[in-house]
Amino acid sequence: MSLPNPAELIRQMAVDLRAHLARRHISEPRYIGIRTGGVWVAQALQEAMGDTSPMGTLDVSFYRDDFSQNGLHPQVRPSELPFEVEGQHLVLVDDVLMSGRTIRAALNELFDYGRPASVTLVCLLDLDAGELPIRPNVLGATLSLAAHERVKLTGPAPLALERQDLASASAL
């Protein structure tokens, strides 16, 4: 099975996001990308939407519920939100939705900054392996992978998807 082209997915996601925002009567959303791949997707999506407003970035490393098991990611950076969260309509963007735990962590962090009017979740890929009841409002594609497979977004330009085989990586 070949992996989809991120640029094509993002073009369609922009169409779907416009429709979603119009249905909800949201005219000035604030974009937030989850590091790292979600930031790349958010930048491309915001460009496709013709929106030049400042974009926020979240690093959810300290908010993950598996922090004590997996340890801290070696490249933790501070989150940057160049706007108030309180009362804003937010578009939260991630590259790959798997268990839902990254999104849960992102929502926890966002609410530490204030109470948004709404959060629209946008994901490039859903791996259909959810452990939490989290579903994107706008989705590029759903992929079903074997238990030993993962997908990684590379970028920032051009964006590309690569399949990773955890079984062969652990055999090394």
From Swiss-Prot:
PANTHER family: BIFUNCTIONAL PROTEIN PYRR. It catalyses: UMP + diphosphate = 5-phospho-alpha-D-ribose 1-diphosphate + uracil. This is Bifunctional protein PyrR. It comes from the Bacteria. Regulates the transcription of the pyrimidine nucleotide (pyr) operon in response to exogenous pyrimidines. Also displays a weak uracil phosphoribosyltransferase activity which is not physiologically significant. Coiled coil: none annotated. Keywords: Glycosyltransferase, Transcription, Transcription regulation, Transferase. Belongs to the purine/pyrimidine phosphoribosyltransferase family. PyrR subfamily. One of its GO terms (biological process) is regulation of DNA-templated transcription. It comes from Pseudomonas putida (strain GB-1). Its EC number is 2.4.2.9. It is an enzyme of class 2 (transferase). Transmembrane segments: none annotated. The keyword Signal does not apply. A motif (PRPP-binding) lies at residues 90-102. NCBIfam families: PRK05205.1-1 (NF003545). One of its GO terms (molecular function) is uracil phosphoribosyltransferase activity. InterPro entries: PRibTrfase_dom, PRTase-like, PyrR, PyrR_bifunctional.
